[in-house]
Regions:
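PRPP-associated nucleotide enzymes
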Residues: 1-122, 130-215
């Protein structure tokens, strides 16, 4: 697993899908100042990294959730990754909308789902865990047995871990914030003196003291 974590981290950094900028923080929609920006959509534009990531998703599902009978994902964010990985495994795939459509059959869950079907949710990233939990709850309400989730990347935030534990969602990620920072430092993407601030951000994103007075 550690080998996967490092390979995926290297790939995401190489294509700019994960970008670290501790000295010029990004601003998230929530208003939080962040030293990291993640855009896993860029994986789809890089065939070598895409192949690595989708194969890693399939390998992780086989290892962690061998009973899986189908793949589900959140609409748009994890759709392409779930579709490719499901194809590699020969499993059916569907996705869950944030809300039911207001036209047609008014489906929230797209794709065939049978009562008691054992599914794994594919996510592109996990921060606070909110969207993943909503997806899992929708699948459970529809009668699925959700074995867990696989994400490409996780910030590893304590709030997210706590929320997932409370919702009884087991989540496994290909790589995480700590691995990204370690690889980024080793390969010269960031200077060593920025690492303590990065780790302080991960521990408490709402506390801007990690910026050392910068606003």
């Amino acid at each position: 697993m550690n080998d996967i974590k490092e390979r995926v981290a290297r790939g995401l950094l190489a294509i700019g899908a994960v970008f670290l900028r501790p000295e010029e923080p990004f601003t998230w929609a929530s208003g939080i100042k962040s030293p990291i920006y993640c855009d896993n959509r860029l994986i789809l534009t890089a065939p070598d990294v895409r192949s690595e990531v989708e194969a890693a998703i399939a390998e992780t599902v086989r290892r962690e959730f061998p009973e899986a009978e189908a793949r589900m994902c959140t609409a748009t964010a994890g759709s392409a990754h779930a579709a490719i990985a499901a194809h590699l495994m020969g499993l059916p795939m569907g996705y869950v909308r944030s809300g039911a459509k207001d036209h047609g059959r008014q489906n929230r869950i797209e794709g065939k789902l049978t009562e008691g079907e054992k599914v794994v949710v594919i996510e592109d990233l996990i921060s606070t865990g909110g969207s993943l939990i909503e997806t899992v709850e929708a699948l459970r309400e529809a009668g699925a047995e959700v074995l867990g989730a696989v994400s490409i990347f996780t910030y590893g935030m304590e709030k997210g871990k706590q929320r997932l534990a409370e919702a009884k969602v087991r989540a496994v990620s290909l790589t995480d914030f700590d691995e990204i920072v370690a690889v980024a430092e080793a390969e010269g993407y960031i200077p060593a003196h920025t690492v303590p601030g990065l780790m302080a951000f991960r521990a408490n994103p709402s506390d801007e003291s990690w910026m050392g007075g910068k606003k």
